[in-house]
């Protein structure tokens, strides 16, 4: 497997603080991504932010993760992800189709207590933020690890995640694995449903998950849930 197929970045904190130019107004359409760690990845070096990105009419084949957002403490207060839309996407044999990881363990200090602590820390100049994300009209078949894995910072929760008209099913011979590159989670997960932690507003509408082991959704730290079946 190679690296991420498409990676959108805007630099580490020294670059973001100096130039303050986010990656913005990006359109990705009619692309086929295959055999990568992530199909479309935002971050983790995004200290100037990523805003107003739309990905539509794409196909993902045999990647570890499909729509992947990765950040961590230390990226800075200008490291804001906002206005993100993923729509009309088909996936086949993607291990975990949707990932938001606020504890990405990159860089020499990636495994440090500061980066990996799951308890709320003080919000300061180093704290990144994830605002509004929308996943709409997406089908993923032959998944392995998890339907979706969303883990925000406890001190700076993800503001809003919308999932609408989503269909997910698992491979019969699904193999276990780790849904996100972070410490403190099970590395042998298989056929998990939707895992959601530390989100202010989570909107689920017309979500179909077939063949998961356990509950369809596991939640903690969700301030508001709108579930329209």
Go through the PLM ranges and name each one.
Residues 1-229:
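Extracellular/periplasmic carbohydrate-active domains that bind, remodel
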